[in-house]
Curated annotation (Swiss-Prot):
Membership in a protein family: Belongs to the universal ribosomal protein uS10 family.
Cited Gene3D superfamilies: Ribosomal protein S10 domain
Organism (species): Nitrosomonas europaea (strain ATCC 19718 / CIP 103999 / KCTC 2705 / NBRC 14298)
Name used for this protein in its record: Small ribosomal subunit protein uS10
GO process annotations (BP): translation
Disulphide-bridged cysteine pairs: none
Length: 102
């Protein structure tokens, strides 16, 4: 796997989980001899929802809710077979979504 790059994109609602997972991936990749760029924090996506408090009247009275989606981007440059095997065996928390592109 020479002159290749693995791009890993992490997505989660909790920034503590995503940072912990990113550190775990970086340590695993470095331990197997690969070069890691990142984790790079991408802009947090904030979705806001306005909901009426009352079912009938009082349109001006509303509750506001938001969901924050945190993103991290990492590049693993020149990965070995050992690196790929170690990353596949890695056990990450359930709240972290992982996208891998070769």
């Amino acid at each position: 796997m020479q002159n290749q790059k693995i791009r890993i994109r992490l997505k989660a609602f909790d920034y503590r989980l995503i940072d912990k997972s990113a550190i775990e991936i970086v340590e695993t990749a470095k331990r197997t001899g690969a070069v890691v760029k990142g984790p790079v924090p991408l802009p947090t996506r904030i979705e806001r929802f306005d909901v009426l408090r009352s079912p009938h009247v009082n349109k001006t009275s509303r509750d506001q809710f938001e969901i924050r989606t945190h993103l991290r981007l990492m590049d693993i440059i020149d990965p070995t077979d050992k690196t790929v095997d170690a990353l596949m065996k890695l056990d990450l928390p359930a709240g972290v979504d992982v996208e891998i592109k070769l």
